[in-house]
């Protein structure tokens, strides 16, 4: 079952009014990073992320160069209830503009900043203002779910 706007208003009462949607909440762009160096996912739990270099804004606007992967850090920090999972979906304006946003599932009990990968597939740079809504979080009730015990949240 997808949690609707009125349930989400109770769970997240401090959002801006424009973040509440009928079937989710919009997350806003906070910080942007370029990936540098090598990462790896090896046997067992051997994970190595590439280095992240923060991208500065020009007058509050980030510029995504063509065919470069960027990590977008979103606001606000989320605390996902233990009986809920979250699907993160890109805003359709980005897709219609040639910017793909790659996401993952938010596990029950995860708490922290959400980061997604974005790639501008257009030939020209794409500009996004700090604080713009870029991803919609859709909350799904998860029966008999375990709790998040990964490396990236608290």
Swiss-Prot record:
Keyword Nucleus part of the UniProt annotation: no
InterPro entries, sorted: dCTP_deaminase (IPR011962), dUTPase-like_sf (IPR036157), dUTPase_archaeal (IPR023537), dUTPase_trimeric (IPR033704)
Catalysed reaction(s) here are: dUTP + H2O = dUMP + diphosphate + H(+)
For whether the record's keyword set contains tRNA-binding, the answer is no
Question: Which pathway is it part of?
Answer: Pyrimidine metabolism; dUMP biosynthesis; dUMP from dCTP (dUTP route): step 2/2
Which keywords does this chain's UniProt record carry? Hydrolase, Nucleotide metabolism
Q: Name one GO biological process term.
A: dUMP biosynthetic process
Supply the EC number(s): 3.6.1.23
Question: Would you say which domain of life the source belongs to?
Answer: Archaea
One Pfam match, given by its short name, reads DCD
Give the molecular function GO annotations: dCTP deaminase activity; dUTP diphosphatase activity
> What protein family is recorded?
Belongs to the dCTP deaminase family. Archaeal dUTPase subfamily.
PANTHER family, per the entry: DCTP DEAMINASE, DEOXYURIDINE 5'-TRIPHOSPHATE NUCLEOTIDOHYDROLASE
**Tell me, what does this protein do in biology?**
This enzyme is involved in nucleotide metabolism: it produces dUMP, the immediate precursor of thymidine nucleotides and it decreases the intracellular concentration of dUTP so that uracil cannot be incorporated into DNA.
Under what name is this protein listed?
A: Probable deoxyuridine 5'-triphosphate nucleotidohydrolase
Q: What lineage is on file? A: Archaea, Methanobacteriati, Methanobacteriota, Methanomada group, Methanopyri
């Amino acid at each position: 079952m997808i949690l609707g706007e009125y349930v989400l208003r109770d769970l997240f009462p401090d959002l801006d009014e424009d973040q509440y949607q009928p079937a989710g909440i919009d997350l806003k762009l906070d910080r942007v990073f370029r990936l540098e160096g090598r990462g790896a996912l090896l046997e067992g739990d051997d994970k190595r992320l590439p280095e992240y270099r923060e991208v500065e804004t020009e007058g509050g606007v980030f510029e995504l160069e063509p065919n470069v992967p960027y990590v977008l850090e979103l606001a606000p920090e989320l605390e996902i209830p233990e009986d809920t999972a979250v699907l993160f979906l890109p805003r359709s304006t980005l897709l219609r503009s040639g910017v793909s946003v790659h996401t993952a599932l938010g596990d029950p009990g995860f708490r922290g900043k959400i980061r997604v990968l974005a790639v501008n597939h257009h030939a020209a740079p794409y500009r996004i203002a700090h604080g713009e809504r870029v991803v919609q979080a859709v909350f799904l009730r998860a029966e008999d779910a375990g709790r998040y015990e990964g490396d990236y949240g608290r």
